[in-house]
Amino acid sequence: KVLFLLVLFSSLVFANERILLNVIKNVSIPNVQNTIENARILQQDLNTQNFTNFLQSWKKVEALYFAGDLNEDFLDTPRYIDVFNNLKEDLNSQMKMVIESKDDAKTALFKNSFKTINALEYMIFNDNEISKREKELSIVILNSMISHLEEIKTVYETYLLKPTKDEKWENALVINTLIASSYRLKEWRIGNASGNSSKFKNDAKNERAEYFLSQNSFAAIDAILDAHNQIVKKNPYYDFAAFAMDKGAAIQLLVVIDKIKEMQDELKVLPKDDFTKANKLFNSAKDLHNAYYVSLIEQLSITGKILDADGD
């Protein structure tokens, strides 16, 4: 009887609340703001730890990117910040030419891909010393990324003031964003380097990892998993966990949480950024994706988006 009253009270308290609006307010906006602050810190001191901090905060924003669906003008914004697995050209060789160019920093960085975190990684980690030229270029690159991050933040703040979608659409957006993120985690960020993806079956190669130069690929994966936890773990507001439990999906949700922990535990015991030993990590990522895409989404009665080979 007491439990029933508690559940009823909880339902009444959260009766008019919406998951996406709470996520934007409590997760998305703080994550973007943290990334902006870390970018500014990195501008002041281009060191290894500051780069890792910025990278991890950005991965959280990217993993839970709702802005492109809320305002289609910003659908491609993440690709102005990060081109991993979305670029056919050799960015590193192009950035080498940018450094050697006599043009001023803004002119030299004329392509969008030159102003991404991937380009920044090359600036900082291509050798053991950061030259004056590389510092100048890095500041311009970070200014560009900060500008895009400010735009993302504005999209979220605008939507909070005037939501334009219905609650059912919003709920579907949250779960489908988690599904797409888990697919990219499995295929792009683990499978391509570990030799478990369909594209590179039985051909493990650490050089394919997302942040091979800076040895931050595991750190990026860990940050993405932290972002997932921000959604699926219980919070003091009406959240995805409360919604899932209301729909009778508590068991399916616990499987998701367990798989995230399993992956984070495995990251701690693996040699740093060594994907040649990441079979277990890949299998856990596969289980996580299936827990979202098969079990949880079915229990929630939400239609999943069909993912193509690129996870889009």
What is each stretch, according to the model?
Residues V2-L12:
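Sec-dependent N-terminal signal peptides
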Residues N16-D312:
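Mature extracytoplasmic or organellar-lumen-exposed domains after removal of signal/transit peptides
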